Amino acid sequence: VHLTGEEKAAVTGLWGKVNVEEVGGEALGRLLVVYPWTQRFFDSFGDLSSPSAVMGNPKVKAHGKKVLNSFSDGLKNLDNLKGTFAKLSELHCDKLHVDPENFRLLGNVLVCVLARHFGKEFTPQVQAAYQKVVAGVATALAHKYH
């Protein structure tokens, strides 16, 4: 991902304020609610029968935190996203058979959740920088797909 110095500063500056547990759980939960077909990858998570069940599900929250911890690793390695996410790409492709489009959807949901959490601090410039990052992460996660 090519970010200017200003964009990198905006992304990392805001990310330092992110509660990965809260934002991760909300982002993954919203993905599962808004795009219900993504739930098929989470059969072992128990009750996903309604929006409130999804948003209150402890396994959704825990996996959302795990996802954002990986995203944090990506932010530390913006110049090597493919390398950073190679193993996760392989896992999601070969073992889990996740549709790579879901990575793009989750990235867009994450941007919306960040906007909701940070309000005016999530300026159009910050949003544009985050859109670049989530697109780069989605591309890196889809890298092992044929």
UniProtKB/Swiss-Prot annotation:
InterPro entries, from UniProt?
Globin, Globin-like_sf, Globin/Proto, Hemoglobin_b, Hemoglobin_oxygen_transport
- The Globin domain sits at 2-146
**What is the tissue specificity?**
Red blood cells.
Give me the Gene Ontology terms describing cellular component.
blood microparticle; haptoglobin-hemoglobin complex; hemoglobin complex
Protein's name according to its UniProt entry: Hemoglobin subunit beta
Summarize the subunit comment.
Heterotetramer of two alpha chains and two beta chains.
- Fetch the Gene3D superfamilies from UniProt: Globins (1.10.490.10)
Additional comments on file?
A: Ghost bat has two hemoglobin components in the ratio 3:2. They share identical beta-chains and differ by three replacements in the alpha chains.
At the top level of its lineage, which domain of life is listed? Eukaryota
Q: What are the N-acetylvaline sites (modified residues) in this protein? A: V1
The positions annotated for binding heme b are H63, H92
Q: PROSITE patterns this protein is in? A: GLOBIN
**What is the organism field in this record?**
Macroderma gigas (Australian ghost bat)
As stated in the Swiss-Prot or TrEMBL entry, residues carrying the post-translational modification N6-acetyllysine are K59, K82, K144
Chain positions found as Phosphoserine: S44
Sorted keywords for this record are: Acetylation, Heme, Iron, Metal-binding, Oxygen transport, Phosphoprotein, S-nitrosylation, Transport
Give the sites modified to S-nitrosocysteine.
Answer: C93
Modification Phosphothreonine occurs at: T12
- What is the documented function of this protein? Involved in oxygen transport from the lung to the various peripheral tissues.
Give the gene that encodes this protein: HBB
Q: Which family does it belong to?
A: Belongs to the globin family.
GO MF annotation, one:
oxygen binding
A Pfam family per the record:
Globin
Q: Name one GO biological process term.
A: hydrogen peroxide catabolic process
